[in-house]
Amino acid sequence: MASRPDGDVWNIVDNDKDSQHYGRNFKFDFSYISSEEIKDVVKDYVWQNYRVGNKSLSSLYNEVKACFFQFIRFADTRNITSLKGLTNTDVDHFISYLHTTISERTKKPFGTGGQRVILNTLKSIIRWCQLHRPNDVPVTEIFTGNEYIGVNRKLKIDFIPDDVVAQINEALKTEENPYLKYGIIILQSTGMRIGD
């Protein structure tokens, strides 16, 4: 079977003898993708990666069934019908969407690891398209690279300069709002940073 299957539902049996899923039938269902343009890109991505052997069938299945599904839910709410028009702002909004989405399975928000996997699936599809279907993705870079910082990376914290802290302390003497005043005092005692 050298050509891509027709239709929105594909049944592919894992025939890799070294795979733990050898002989398992994977039912890929692309019908949840409302945009025909995005659907065609994702089908190509799955088929080419499967045929070449870049990714295991189970990995591709999980990417399409769980991870990319979340992007399509987001895209439908924002009327995104093409990957070509994606911007860094869309990626930021997608990350915010992932922060606030409740998992249907666990009834809890997605953990940071799950959010990273979902975003990496979108990145993987975009990166693949940059090589194989460059006309279907943005020309400019839409990922900053620090969307989800790894745990082993050096954490850089921007501290507030001493002269600014002195100005804050002077202003606290005359601050009338008790919530603001004591909130800043608590932040200072716990290590206030610029981001706070």
Question: Where are the regions a protein language model picked out?
Answer:
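Short linear capping/connector segments at secondary-structure termini
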Residues: 144-148
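Charge-rich, intrinsically disordered N-terminal extensions
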Residues: 1-143, 153-154, 167, 171, ...
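Acidic donor-binding helix in nucleotide-sugar-dependent glycosyltransferases
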Residues: 196
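Long, amphipathic, Lys/Arg-enriched alpha-helical "connector/arm" segment
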Residues: 149-179, 189, 193
